[in-house]
């Protein structure tokens, strides 16, 4: 399937499985009359494959070592992308950032790294399912930067177009999205 056909098919899947109308309170605390819940798309076999494919293609020239982000939205994405990158002979390892470090066991804030492995000096992409103001991704950026990694990009599947672009620009972070909310609202 061509990139444009993959993108169109994935938009259909998102529209049918993950987009809705109706009043909702977002993670940012804002109220909205539409929502994206990308979990049904990320956990659908075809949706997961297309998200991984399009994300992998978007990162192809970035020389990325790791991909991850804040739980829960980043977990299925990072895992699917890691698997596809291995199959494409260009491995990108995955991790995720806990919203709150575990209070037992290793008490880690960043999960997915082997014992003795570190993000220090690694080129990382922060990935997110849906971005409104960018607050969740910024939390992940802060944790990953604290570990010594370089953030090369913040990539979201759907940008709600409600301030994230400006917030990331202000923070000096490159930001891209696969889709914009207006692509779903204007149809």
UniProtKB/Swiss-Prot annotation:
Keywords: Glycosyltransferase, Magnesium, Pyrimidine biosynthesis, Transferase. Orotate binds at residues 132, 160. GO terms for molecular function: magnesium ion binding; orotate phosphoribosyltransferase activity. CDD domains: PRTases_typeI (cd06223). NCBIfam families: pyrE (TIGR00336). The keyword Glycosyltransferase applies. Catalyzes the transfer of a ribosyl phosphate group from 5-phosphoribose 1-diphosphate to orotate, leading to the formation of orotidine monophosphate (OMP). GO terms for biological process: 'de novo' UMP biosynthetic process; pyrimidine nucleobase biosynthetic process. This is Orotate phosphoribosyltransferase. It catalyses: orotidine 5'-phosphate + diphosphate = orotate + 5-phospho-alpha-D-ribose 1-diphosphate. Its cofactor is Mg(2+). 5-phospho-alpha-D-ribose 1-diphosphate binds at residues 98-99, 102, 104, 128-136. Its EC number is 2.4.2.10. PANTHER family: OROTATE PHOSPHORIBOSYLTRANSFERASE, URIDINE 5'-MONOPHOSPHATE SYNTHASE. Pathway: Pyrimidine metabolism; UMP biosynthesis via de novo pathway; UMP from orotate: step 1/2. It holds the Pfam family Pribosyltran. Homodimer. Belongs to the purine/pyrimidine phosphoribosyltransferase family. PyrE subfamily.
């Amino acid at each position: 399937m061509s990139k444009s056909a993959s993108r169109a098919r994935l938009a259909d899947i998102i529209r049918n499985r993950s987009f809705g109308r109706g009043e909702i309170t977002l993670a940012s605390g804002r109220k909205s009359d539409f929502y994206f819940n990308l979990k049904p798309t990320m956990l659908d076999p075809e949706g997961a494959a297309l998200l991984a494919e399009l994300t992998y293609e978007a990162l192809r020239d970035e020389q990325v070592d790791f991909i991850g982000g804040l739980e829960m939205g980043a977990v299925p994405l990072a895992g699917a992308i890691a698997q596809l990158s291995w199959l494409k002979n260009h491995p990108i390892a995955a991790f995720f950032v806990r919203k709150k470090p575990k209070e037992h066991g290793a008490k880690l804030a960043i999960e997915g790294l082997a014992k003795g492995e570190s993000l220090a000096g690694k080129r990382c992409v922060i990935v997110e399912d849906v971005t409104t103001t960018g607050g969740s991704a910024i939390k992940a950026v802060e944790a990953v930067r604290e570990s010594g990694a370089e953030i090369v990009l913040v990539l979201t599947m759907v940008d709600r177009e409600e301030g994230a672009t400006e917030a990331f620009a202000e923070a000096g972070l490159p930001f891209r999205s696969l889709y914009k909310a207006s692509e779903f609202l204007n149809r």
